Amino acid sequence: MKVRPSVKKICPKCKVIRRKGVLRVICDNPRHKQRQG
């Protein structure tokens, strides 16, 4: 999980979703997991 000021899709399978007001990237590749905050 990377915590970044701006989250971006890294590959076509990445999805940006909002959970409890936090932007997250979920992906099949665990190295692509990110969250904003």
UniProtKB/Swiss-Prot annotation:
Taken from the UniProt entry, a GO cellular component term is: cytoplasm
GO terms under biological process: translation
Instruction: List GO molecular-function terms, semicolon-separated.
Output: structural constituent of ribosome
Which controlled-vocabulary keywords does the entry list?
A: Ribonucleoprotein, Ribosomal protein
The highest taxon in the source lineage is Bacteria
Q: Does the keyword Transferase apply?
A: no
One Pfam short name: Ribosomal_L36
Q: What NCBIfam families does its record include?
A: rpmJ_bact
- Family per UniProt? Belongs to the bacterial ribosomal protein bL36 family.
* Protein name as catalogued: Large ribosomal subunit protein bL36
Q: Per UniProt, what is the name of the gene that codes for the protein in this document?
A: rpmJ
